């Protein structure tokens, strides 16, 4: 703790130029929390644990907040020598960014919508221009789409341009600001959007008049994700969350009326399930889904008949995941009933009934399979339906793929009505055979992430695809499904990273054999073209590995400074993620969750053993569930990593999953298992939960944990407990000063108060006091936060400028 000298009231001393005596300044020390063993101990399956730091989970305890503030002060002290490097990194982020920019417009109804950013502004402004009918092939009415989006210039407004939501104006006076989702009304006069000013992701529903910018409704609070309109532009659909932050209900709010009169459309009582919805591209429907990790059910709600209840179109079958997309006169479904990697099926539309809601008896014999994946892939993920085509998202060989099919029979209202009446509509000749959207995208081992850009208009005729990688800035490509031709609409400009400069780097896919001798782990590796595998370079290994989320290679200007300094960057596509398909995910969760951690360690050892990275110069990073990964590998292989960046880390996993009252816990039991009822799951989680496996007397890597006080997903008490346990375990250790010679000025072995928490391998925690799971809002706040983390990591591997 710093002790500053007290100001003097003695004027005579000042007049005489004599300074009052100063108290001896004491060097700051790492904060240490009092150990308060839990009484009675936590006891399950014959195992007891008197947790000494469980009290740190109490966010209402002033002593806990005081400790958080002291942790921030200690982080300030440790990172103070790194300010110059942090400032340099921010300058480089800025230099690589075109700050005044626009996005490719997306059509919704009668307008093209796009975002603007401006130099000096923290947030985006959502804009629009009216649709201009310039395509001679289109009939002269508003539903006819031009062949391609218009060109919008960053330096001047477009004719007829107007502001939909200016986030900078809305954020004025707020320490934190985030727009969760937004949707314009069908008549184009209003926009409904979700506002968060604390970071806890409990939103307020706002409705704004676009022409005047006036807020016309801001009465509905405690809202979850999702916003959609009725066809008459009078009512808005939203979700409500319960005390455990589970979106469990869908409600309909009439704009301008008292929320007490809102109508509940759907209630999900099963705590394992969470509801969400989206406006279908077919404007007649909103698609509502209730899903757990392994099971889901889909309803359709008719926007033209807002007084009707949603109707179930899939039923609920345990272990079967399903998604549904209205395709005009029928449904397209992705489901796992026949293959865990998914099947694409076609089915009749439902008949809308006033009572709706209840899970009807679905006749699965009317589902006709169009595409079925085998047990090892490809993994079918999603289908997007339009008036004349559909696009299928999938994974194959560890990478993203897109296929499309075109309609061979037109969509008509008569056909839609017939589909709803028939049990077995004639599915023959409705769709063409699937074709690749960009057939050569992955030729010669190219690493590329392809995704559709979120087109929302039923009448769109082009497929817009965004292609990117770690070294390739996002490129938006328009594909004409009539002949498969493609042309580039826009490539994101990145100053200081043009094609010639990118040519100096290699981005490749390598395969690492796991310790079991047969599992092949895909890794995306980026390095200088002239890099030598001589065991001297610094390395940066990033991982996630949970929830079947794929950690795909995507571009970020924030990575460029490290790569340009010669750091070898690697993405480990480990089990528990979805990179290789559903089976890859299943082989890294519940009873076999440790595969996630051993895969990451095996990739790290490959980087060192192959000479890509020097021993003691490997950075590891992960966030959220990837933070659990960081905590686990820190315990399992502390000698492998020089420094750990753990963002909002889920490091007290067993404690959280044992408490059903906490946000998300019950729904997480399908992901991790239920340790309350299952002894084996308890034992497995006990074996890897990071906080409970910190060992005394171990030389751990330098660690920076980052969190936010209002994070709902991973409570800040988790990293707080973890950091305190690490300090407790390492107190009194001695660290070899000789390591300083390996890293030059990066290592300083000064110790404070007799502890081994030296600047050489500090353990620090940075807490954002007004933010949520994603950290500070606004791009400059985000840059500053990440620059501090990156400077901490780079300095630990000998990169100080």
Show where each model-derived region lies.
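Structural motif
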Residues: 120-130, 200-206, 244-252, 294-300, ...
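Cap/lid segment of the alpha/beta-hydrolase catalytic domain
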Residues: 164-185, 194-200, 211-216, 481-485, ...
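Active-site-proximal cap/loop segments of hydrolase catalytic domains
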Residues: 572-801
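Non-catalytic accessory segments flanking enzyme active sites
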Residues: 62-183, 194, 273-302, 307-327, ...
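Long hydrophobic segments that form regular secondary structure
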Residues: 268-356, 360-368, 373-375, 383, ...
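Short loop/turn segments that connect beta-strands within beta-propeller blades
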Residues: 132, 209-213, 254-258, 302-306, ...
């Amino acid at each position: 703790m710093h002790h500053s000298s007290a100001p003097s009231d003695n004027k005579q001393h000042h007049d005489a130029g004599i300074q009052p005596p100063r108290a001896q300044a004491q060097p700051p020390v790492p904060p240490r929390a009092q150990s308060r063993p839990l009484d009675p101990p936590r006891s399950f399956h014959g195992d007891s644990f008197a947790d000494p730091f469980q009290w740190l989970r109490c966010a209402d305890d002033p002593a806990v907040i005081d400790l958080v503030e002291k942790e921030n002060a200690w982080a300030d002290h440790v990172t103070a020598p790194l300010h110059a490097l942090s400032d340099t990194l921010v300058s480089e982020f800025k230099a690589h960014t075109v700050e005044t920019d626009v996005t490719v417009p997306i059509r919704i109804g009668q307008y093209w919508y796009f975002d603007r950013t401006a130099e000096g502004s923290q947030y985006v402004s959502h804009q629009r221009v009216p649709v201009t009918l310039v395509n001679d092939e289109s009939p002269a009415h508003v539903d006819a789409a031009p062949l391609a989006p218009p060109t919008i210039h960053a330096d001047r407004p477009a004719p007829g341009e107007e502001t939909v939501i200016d986030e900078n104006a809305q954020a004025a006076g707020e320490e934190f600001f985030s727009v969760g989702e937004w949707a314009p009304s069908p008549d184009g006069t209003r926009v409904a959007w979700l506002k968060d000013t604390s970071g806890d992701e409990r939103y307020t529903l706002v409705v704004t008049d676009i022409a005047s910018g006036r807020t016309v409704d801001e009465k509905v609070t405690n809202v979850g994700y999702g916003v959609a309109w009725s066809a008459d532009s009078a009512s808005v659909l939203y979700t409500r969350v319960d005390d455990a932050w589970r979106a469990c209900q869908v409600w309909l709010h009439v704009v301008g009326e008292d929320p007490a009169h809102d109508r509940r459309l759907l209630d999900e009582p099963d705590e394992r399930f969470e509801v969400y919805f989206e406006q279908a591209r077919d404007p007649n429907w909103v698609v509502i889904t209730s899903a757990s990790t392994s099971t889901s059910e889909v309803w359709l709600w008719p926007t033209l008949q807002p007084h009707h209840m949603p109707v179930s179109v899939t039923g609920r079958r345990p272990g079967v995941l399903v998604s549904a997309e209205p395709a005009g006169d029928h449904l397209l479904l992705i489901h796992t009933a026949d293959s865990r990697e998914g099947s694409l099926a076609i089915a009749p539309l439902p008949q809308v009934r006033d009572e709706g809601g209840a899970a009807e008896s679905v006749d699965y014999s009317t589902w006709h399979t169009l595409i079925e994946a085998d047990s090892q892939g490809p993994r079918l993920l999603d289908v997007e339906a339009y008036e004349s085509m559909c696009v299928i998202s999938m994974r194959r060989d560890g990478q993203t793929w897109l296929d499309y099919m075109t309609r061979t029979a037109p969509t008509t209202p008569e056909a839609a009505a017939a589909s709803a009446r028939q049990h077995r509509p004639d599915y023959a000749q409705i769709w063409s055979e699937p074709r690749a959207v960009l057939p050569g995208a992955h030729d010669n081992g190219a690493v590329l992430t392809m995704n559709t850009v979120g087109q929302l208009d039923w009448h769109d005729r082009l497929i817009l695809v965004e292609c990117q990688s770690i070294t390739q800035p996002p490129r938006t490509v328009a594909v004409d499904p009539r002949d498969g031709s493609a042309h580039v609409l826009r490539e994101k400009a990145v100053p200081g990273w043009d094609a010639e400069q990118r040519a100096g780097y290699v981005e490749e896919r390598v395969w690492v054999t796991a310790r079991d001798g047969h599992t092949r782990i895909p890794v995306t590796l980026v390095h200088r073209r002239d890099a030598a595998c001589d065991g001297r370079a610094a390395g940066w290994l990033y991982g996630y590995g949970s929830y079947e989320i794929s950690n795909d290679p995507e571009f970020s200007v924030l990575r460029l400074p490290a790569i340009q300094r010669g750091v070898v960057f690697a993405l480990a596509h480990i089990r528990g993620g979805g990179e290789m398909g559903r089976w890859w995910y299943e082989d890294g969760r519940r009873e076999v969750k440790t595969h996630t951690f051993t895969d990451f360690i095996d990739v790290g050892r490959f980087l060192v053993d192959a000479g890509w990275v020097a021993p003691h110069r490997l950075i590891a990073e992960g966030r959220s569930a990837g933070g659990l990964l960081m905590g686990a590998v820190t315990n399992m292989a502390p000698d492998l990593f020089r420094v750990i960046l753990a963002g909002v880390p889920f490091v007290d996993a067993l404690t959280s999953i044992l408490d059903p009252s906490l946000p998300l816990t019950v729904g997480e039991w399908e992901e991790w298992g239920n340790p309350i009822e299952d002894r084996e799951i308890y034992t497995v989680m006990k074996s890897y939960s990071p906080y409970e496996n910190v060992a005394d007397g171990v030389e751990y890597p330098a660690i920076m944990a980052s969190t936010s006080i209002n994070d709902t997903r991973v409570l800040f008490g988790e990293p707080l407990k973890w950091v305190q346990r690490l300090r407790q375990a390492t107190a009194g250790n001695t660290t070899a000063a000789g390591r300083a010679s390996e890293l030059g000025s990066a290592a300083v072995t000064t110790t404070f108060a007799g502890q081994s928490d030296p600047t050489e391998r500090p353990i620090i925690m940075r807490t954002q006091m007004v933010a949520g799971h994603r950290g500070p809002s606004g791009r400059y706040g985000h840059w500053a936060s990440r620059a501090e983390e990156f400077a901490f990591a780079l300095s630990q591997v000998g990169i100080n400028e």
